[in-house]
C-alpha cells in the first residue's frame, strides 16, 4: 500500500512527523534501530558518511580561510535553502571545533594565518623582508594571499613564486587556482619564466597528459619537452567485463613487470584500496610509521608496490602507475560529487569549467609514472575521462601494449618462420631478445 506525501510538507519542515502519523494509522510497526548500527551494517552508508565528513571539513576550511565565523556562515547562506540547510547542519560542528581550540588554548593553521594578518595590519609586526619566495604557489588560499598582501603593504619586497596551475588540486583545503592563473591581476606587472623541460617521464606521456589537461581553456598554455624522446604510447587501458576481472587482468600485468621496479596503485578515494580485495594474490598492509598502504603481490616480492590516493601521491613518482576505478560511478574518477551551493558561496573566484579540479587531479595521477600508466576500466562503465581518451587516441591503440618483463619495453608482433610471435621493441636499441608465443585462444 502506498502512503501519499506532499512536497509542501518537506518545505514546511513537518514531513517526517506527518509520515509517522500516516504509518501509525495503517498499524505499521516501528522498530528503533540505532543510527550507527545502520551505517555499520551497510557499506554504502559508510561512503555517505565519508562524503559528509569530507563536505563538512571543506566548508569549515573554506569558511575559516575567508575569516567567516559560524554565525556569519549561516547568515551568508540564508538566500539559498539548500545552502542554509547544510550550513545549519555543519554549524554545531564548527562551534564545537572552535570551542575545543579555545578551551585547549590551541590554534590551527587557518588561525595562524588570520592572526598573522591581524598583527601586520595593526602594525604589531614590521616586515623587514626584502625577498619572499613562495613554493607550490598553485595551492595558495585566500588567507595566504591576504597575508602576503598585508606583508607587502606593510613594507614592499620582491616576490618570487614557483607553481604549476595544472597541479592545483586542493580546493577542498581552500586553495584558489585563480591566484596563479591570473597572477598579474593580483600582483601587477610581473616577469614570467617557464620551466618547460622535464626529465621525469617520456615525451609520449607529456603529450597525452598535456593535451588532456589543456582541454580546459582556462589553464595556462604550455609546451613541455622531455629529455626522454620515447614516442611509444605511454598509457594503456586494462579493461574487464566486471570489476573482479579488471583487477585480475591488472594483477596479471603486474606479474609481467620488470624486476625490482616501483609501482603505485592510485585511487580517487581511500576506499578504492578495497578493490584490491578482489584478487587473492594481493595483500595490503598499513604501515603505521609512514602512514602508507603497502601492497604485496604473490610470487613478486621484488616489486615495491604502494597504494596512494592521488592527492597523497602528488610530488612522488614510480616506474609504473595503475589508476583504479576509472568508472562512471558517482564516486568514480572523475568523482561526480558536485560543489554544494554552500561551497560555491564560499569560493571567491569562478572555476566553472566542467570537472576542472578532477581534470587536474587526473593529470597529476597520469604524471606520477616514469615509464607507463595503466588505466583500470570496467566495460560499459567507462568514465568520462576514459571515453575522452578513447575518442582521442582510439580504443585499439590504448590496448595494444604488452610490457616486456625483461627490460620494460613494448612487446610488438613479429612474423617469423614458425608463425607470429611477440618481441621486444628495444631489440635494436639495447639488444633485448625477449620473445613470447602468441596465445591464439586469448
Which stretches of residues belong to each language-model region?
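Short metal-binding segments enriched for Cys and/or His
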Residues: 428-442
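Conserved RecA-like helicase ATPase core segment
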Residues: 145-235
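Short cysteine-rich clusters marking metal-coordination/redox-active sites
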Residues: 404-407, 424
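Core RecA-like ATPase module of SF1/SF2 helicases and allied nucleic-acid translocases
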Residues: 255-357, 361
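C-terminal accessory regions
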Residues: 326-400, 404
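A basic/glycine-biased coupling hinge at the interface between accessory DNA-binding modules
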Residues: 1-107
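Conserved helicase NTPase motor core
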Residues: 79-179, 197, 315
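Inter-lobe coupling/hinge region of RecA-like P-loop helicase motors
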Residues: 189-197, 218-267, 305
Amino acid at each position: 500500500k502506498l502512503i501519499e506525501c506532499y512536497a509542501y510538507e518537506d518545505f514546511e519542515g513537518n514531513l517526517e512527523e506527518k509520515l509517522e502519523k500516516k504509518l501509525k494509522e495503517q498499524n505499521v510497526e516501528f522498530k528503533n534501530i540505532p543510527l550507527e548500527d545502520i551505517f555499520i551494517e551497510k557499506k554504502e552508508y559508510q561512503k555517505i558518511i565519508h562524503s559528509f565528513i569530507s563536505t563538512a571539513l571543506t566548508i569549515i576550511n573554506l569558511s575559516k580561510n575567508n575569516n567567516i565565523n559560524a554565525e556569519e556562515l549561516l547568515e551568508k547562506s540564508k538566500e539559498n535553502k539548500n545552502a542554509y540547510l547544510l550550513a545549519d547542519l555543519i554549524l554545531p560542528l564548527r562551534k564545537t571545533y572552535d570551542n575545543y581550540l579555545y578551551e585547549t588554548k590551541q590554534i590551527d593553521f587557518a588561525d595562524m594565518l588570520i592572526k598573522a594578518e591581524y598583527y601586520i595590519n595593526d602594525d604589531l609586526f614590521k616586515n623587514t623582508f626584502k625577498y619572499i619566495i613562495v613554493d607550490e604557489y598553485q595551492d595558495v588560499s585566500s588567507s595566504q594571499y591576504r597575508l602576503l598582501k598585508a606583508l607587502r603593504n606593510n613594507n614592499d619586497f620582491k616576490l618570487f613564486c614557483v607553481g604549476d596551475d595544472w597541479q592545483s588540486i586542493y580546493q577542498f583545503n581552500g586553495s584558489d587556482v585563480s591566484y596563479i592563473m591570473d597572477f598579474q591581476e593580483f600582483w601587477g606587472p610581473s616577469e614570467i619564466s617557464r620551466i618547460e623541460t622535464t626529465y621525469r617521464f617520456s615525451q609520449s606521456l607529456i603529450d597525452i597528459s598535456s593535451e588532456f589537461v589543456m582541454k580546459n581553456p582556462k589553464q595556462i598554455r604550455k609546451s613541455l619537452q622531455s629529455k626522454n624522446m620515447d614516442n611509444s604510447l605511454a598509457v594503456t587501458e586494462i579493461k574487464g567485463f566486471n570489476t573482479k576481472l579488471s583487477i585480475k587482468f591488472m594483477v596479471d600485468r603486474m606479474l609481467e613487470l620488470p624486476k625490482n621496479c616501483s609501482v603505485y596503485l592510485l585511487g580517487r578515494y581511500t576506499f578504492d584500496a578495497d578493490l584490491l580485495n578482489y584478487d587473492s594474490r594481493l595483500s595490503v598492509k598499513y604501515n603505521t610509521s609512514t602512514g602508507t598502504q603497502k601492497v604485496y603481490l604473490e610470487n613478486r616480492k621484488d616489486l615495491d608496490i604502494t597504494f596512494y590516493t592521488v592527492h597523497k601521491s602528488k610530488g612522488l613518482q614510480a616506474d609504473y602507475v595503475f589508476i583504479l576505478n576509472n568508472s562512471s560511478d558517482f564516486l568514480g574518477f572523475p568523482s561526480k560529487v558536485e560543489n554544494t551551493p554552500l561551497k560555491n558561496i564560499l569560493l571567491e573566484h569562478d572555476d566553472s569549467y566542467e570537472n576542472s579540479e578532477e581534470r587536474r587531479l587526473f593529470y597529476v595521477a597520469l604524471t606520477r609514472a616514469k615509464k607507463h600508466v595503466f588505466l583500470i576500466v570496467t566495460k560499459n562503465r567507462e568514465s568520462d575521462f576514459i571515453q575522452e581518451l578513447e575518442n582521442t587516441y582510439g580504443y585499439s591503440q590504448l590496448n595494444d601494449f604488452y610490457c616486456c618483463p625483461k627490460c620494460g619495453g613494448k612487446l610488438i608482433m613479429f612474423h617469423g618462420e614458425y608463425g607470429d610471435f611477440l618481441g621486444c621493441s628495444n631489440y635494436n636499441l639495447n639488444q633485448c631478445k625477449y620473445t613470447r608465443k602468441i596465445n591464439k585462444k586469448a
